Amino acid sequence: MATGKTVKDVSPHDFVKAYASHLKRSGKIELPLWTDIVKTGRLKELAPYDPDWYYIRAASMARKIYLRGGLGVGAFRRIYGGSKRNGSRPPHFCKSSGGIARHILQQLETMSIVELDTKGGRRITSSGQRDLDQVAGRIAAES
């Protein structure tokens, strides 16, 4: 008896790639004007090269909320942060941009994929969980 596949059953890389293309095709996420010039954090020296980086980040954030829940802007700043290169001085950890995380979370809320959690952060909605599981099922069927 075959059961439905969830996000936990498929490769994270394959899922994020497939869900990002799903978000791009659906047209519900509107790209802000600044996506081609903004850096993703203080630690970065250049803006992302991939023109679809915004969709990939949104898909990754939706997956993380699906798996853990209760994540807010501060948590995503820490997750997507990294080591800032200081030239000849030692590197140090820096958080990523909070504006990008906030904007993506607001977009996911308008699409009713995530909602505010009473305990803080965001959690996945039932329609959002169904949407993510459908994409995971398509990935599992292809492989």
Curated annotation (Swiss-Prot):
<dbReference type="GO" id="GO:0009506">
    <property type="term" value="C:plasmodesma"/>
</dbReference>
<dbReference type="GO" id="GO:0006412">
    <property type="term" value="P:translation"/>
</dbReference>
<keyword id="KW-0687">Ribonucleoprotein</keyword>
<dbReference type="Pfam" id="PF01090">
    <property type="entry name" value="Ribosomal_S19e"/>
</dbReference>
<dbReference type="InterPro" id="IPR018277">
    <property type="entry name" value="Ribosomal_eS19_CS"/>
</dbReference>
<dbReference type="GO" id="GO:0003735">
    <property type="term" value="F:structural constituent of ribosome"/>
</dbReference>
<protein>
    <recommendedName>
        <fullName>Small ribosomal subunit protein eS19y</fullName>
    </recommendedName>
</protein>
<keyword id="KW-0689">Ribosomal protein</keyword>
<dbReference type="InterPro" id="IPR036388">
    <property type="entry name" value="WH-like_DNA-bd_sf"/>
</dbReference>
<dbReference type="GO" id="GO:0022627">
    <property type="term" value="C:cytosolic small ribosomal subunit"/>
</dbReference>
<dbReference type="GO" id="GO:0005730">
    <property type="term" value="C:nucleolus"/>
</dbReference>
<dbReference type="InterPro" id="IPR036390">
    <property type="entry name" value="WH_DNA-bd_sf"/>
</dbReference>
<comment type="similarity">
    <text>Belongs to the eukaryotic ribosomal protein eS19 family.</text>
</comment>
<dbReference type="InterPro" id="IPR001266">
    <property type="entry name" value="Ribosomal_eS19"/>
</dbReference>
<dbReference type="GO" id="GO:0003729">
    <property type="term" value="F:mRNA binding"/>
</dbReference>
